[in-house]
């Protein structure tokens, strides 16, 4: 009886797409059933796609994936074109019959994946999709893949494979949503274009150039980015921006060579101690950056504060997971903290430690920084403020290694080297009240029967900047995969309930008037 009860529960879970609690009667049974039906029908195609290695560093891998996905889009009636890109072509697809009375939406996803170390995976191969469920101990254990093609699929089962969630899963969700509409004879409410990036995992260094070269082809009214994890609650999620990143290396100089600490201690200044004092001057004990002007350009209005406060973050659980007693005091909450530029010391070096440590005063001390930017504080602005602050602490900035003349003239010497930041690493944000934001909000609310979680700006950096700068259109990130998907790591996975619900959400988006 218990086994029958579990089987019935699984069947109902698939048919009703029980990814998250929905308000009673809010979700369309037709959309639920349609999404479940076509998701099930396409699992085999998904597994076959996952079997293709797609290392962003291997052109042959990229070509095979581009070819396979081109066939997949053509099968759904898309017109396609491979966009040349140094041996790693991007894929463009468009549904024919463009209606000038409709808005045109460009869907972005990426077909490349992170490199893998097969020995770190708990299965035979990262490219051999493995179906798993949790056992009584809460551990993932493999079950026959054939169960995926049956009629008793548990939405909590997961498919483990490289790129299952990042980003082949969302690509298959879009294709499956198109299948569902095609079967019903329905046309999307918007003109649909798609671009599949082939180097996202390398930071999309050529995305802007490819878009510029195909500007007319990719012309659109809005950009939807199908990438990234949903909110931790697994509720429908819309993300309206991302921080950028700038990198800087600070070198503080001491004597021309390492000195014996007995002979020269108390006489020659230690650059490691000076660097420590310099870094300490950049932030206070609450974690706020004290460099003058660092936050000044950031303004958050009451409407944005209200939306951020409504994000269902469990900060007590978050701090417990991170293993910290309290958060830094940059914003009122986690979401607000991400709206400001940050300053992070990502590495330091001076002398040696452990068995290799010597009794010397090191000649240099180096700190590597990453500065997370926001649209109001571009990289050049923050790097400029950083340099001014260092000079205000009494340092003379040099280019490269200081000359003998500079050493004789200045007591405190330092160098700041900053990387040229491409548009792919730029911060970008769309107004949450913009037409595209309102359109997606309505689509998700109508489809799922609850308000989506709206993230004003996520803390990480994704390559939207290049696309937004080249296309000159508003964008929204539409994450569809489970937050605990092990993205970029070993044992990457996709929850089947998320797959079905993602199909459902995209059906809703494609049917919502814009």
Regions from the PLM with identified roles:
Residues 21-24:
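N-terminal signal peptide c-region/cleavage motif recognized by signal peptidases
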Residues 27-126, 364:
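N-terminal helical capping/dimerization or prosegment-like subdomains
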Residues 100, 232, 290-364, 375-388, ...:
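An extended, acidic, His-containing surface patch that forms the Zn2+-binding/catalytic region
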Residues 102-193:
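Active-site metal-coordination/substrate-binding segment of hydrolases
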Residues 152-241:
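Acidic/histidine-rich catalytic neighborhood of metal-dependent amide-processing enzymes
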Residues 265-286:
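A short core secondary-structure module
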């Amino acid at each position: 009886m218990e086994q029958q009860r579990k089987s019935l529960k699984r069947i109902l879970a698939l048919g009703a797409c029980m990814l998250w609690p929905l308000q009673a009667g809010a979700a369309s049974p037709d959309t639920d059933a349609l999404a479940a039906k076509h998701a099930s029908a396409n699992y085999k195609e998904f597994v076959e796609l996952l079997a293709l290695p797609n290392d962003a560093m291997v052109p042959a891998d990229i070509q095979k994936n581009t070819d396979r996905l081109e066939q997949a889009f053509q099968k759904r009636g898309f017109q396609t074109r491979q966009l040349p890109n140094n041996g790693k072509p991007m894929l463009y697809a468009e549904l024919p019959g463009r209606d000038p009375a409709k808005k045109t939406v460009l869907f972005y996803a990426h077909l490349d994946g992170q490199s893998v170390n097969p020995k770190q995976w708990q299965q035979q191969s990262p490219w051999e999709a493995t179906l798993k469920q949790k056992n009584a101990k809460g551990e993932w254990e493999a079950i026959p893949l054939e169960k995926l093609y049956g009629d008793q699929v548990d939405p909590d089962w997961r498919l483990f494979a490289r790129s299952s969630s990042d980003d082949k899963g969302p690509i298959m969700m879009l294709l499956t949503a198109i299948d569902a509409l095609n079967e019903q004879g329905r046309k999307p409410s918007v003109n649909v274009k798609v671009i599949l990036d082939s180097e996202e995992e390398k930071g999309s260094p050529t995305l802007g150039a490819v878009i510029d070269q195909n500007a007319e082809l990719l012309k659109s009214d809005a950009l939807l980015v199908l990438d990234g994890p949903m909110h931790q609650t697994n509720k429908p999620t819309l993300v309206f921006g991302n921080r950028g990143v700038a990198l800087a290396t600070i070198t503080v100089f001491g004597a021309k060579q390492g000195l014996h600490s007995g002979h020269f201690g108390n006489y020659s200044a230690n650059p490691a101690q000076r660097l420590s004092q310099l870094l300490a001057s950049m932030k206070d004990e609450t974690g706020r950056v004290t460099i003058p002007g660092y936050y000044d350009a950031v303004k958050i209005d009451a409407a944005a504060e209200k939306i951020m406060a409504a994000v269902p973050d469990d900060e007590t659980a978050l701090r417990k997971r991170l293993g910290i007693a309290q958060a830094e005091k940059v914003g009122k909450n986690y979401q607000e903290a991400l709206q400001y530029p940050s300053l992070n010391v990502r590495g330091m070096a001076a002398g040696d430690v452990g068995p290799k440590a010597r009794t010397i005063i090191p000649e240099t001390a180096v700190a590597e920084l990453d500065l997370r930017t926001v649209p109001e504080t571009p990289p050049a602005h923050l790097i400029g403020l950083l340099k001014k602050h260092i000079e205000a602490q009494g340092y003379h900035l040099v280019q490269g290694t200081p000359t003998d003349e500079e050493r004789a003239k200045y007591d405190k010497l330092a160098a700041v080297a900053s990387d040229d930041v491409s548009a792919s690493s730029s911060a970008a944000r769309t107004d949450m009240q913009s037409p595209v934001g309102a359109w997606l909000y309505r689509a998700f609310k109508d489809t799922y029967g609850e308000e989506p979680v709206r993230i004003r700006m996520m803390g990480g950096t994704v390559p939207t900047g290049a696309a937004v700068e080249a296309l000159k259109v508003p964008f929204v990130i539409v994450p569809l995969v489970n937050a605990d998907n092990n993205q970029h790591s070993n044992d990457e996975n996709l929850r089947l309930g998320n797959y079905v619900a993602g199909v459902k959400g995209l059906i809703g988006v494609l049917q919502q008037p814009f």
